[in-house]
C-alpha cells in the first residue's frame, strides 16, 4: 500500500478526514487545565482551516488512543500531559516519520500548519518514488512488457495504437489492462509504434494489473 505501513494508514493531510487529533493525558488534579488547553489549541487550529478532533474518551487509555489513531492514519497527533501543561506547551507527533517535538501553545497552530504541509510533501514524494520504482517506460519490445507485468508487477508505459484488440491481447497474456492515458510529457511521440502490433501509436497507455 502506498500510504501505509506496519502500523496502519499514513493519510496525506489533504485527504485525511481528521488532520490532527488531540489526546489529553489527564489526571484528576490537572484534568481541567489540560482539557482547557486542548480546547484552546483545537479552536486555534480550526480557525486556520485544520480538521481537528479532541479524543477525550474516558473509557480508553492514552496508549490505546495512540494506536487507534495511528491505525487510522491521522497525519498529526497532539499529546497534552501534566509536563506539557506546566511548560505551556504541547507534544506534537508526525504519523509518517514518528518524529516528536514539544511546541509552545502560543503560535502552535502555525507550527502545526507547517508540519502538515511537510507531511503532505513527504508522502507525495515517497509515493512518486515508489511509482517510479515500479514503472517500466518504453520497453524494448512486447515480450519484455509481458514479462514485467507477469513478474513483480507494476506499471508499464508504452505506445498504443488505440485498438481494443491489442489491449485484449495484453490482458489474455498478463491479466493487465490499460489503467489510464497520461496527458503529460509521457504522451507518445509522433511516429511511435504500438508496443503490441507495430501500427502507428496514437497515445501512450499505462498498463497494469487490477487488484
Would you name each region that the model predicts?
Residues 1-211:
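NTP/phosphate- and nucleic-acid-binding module
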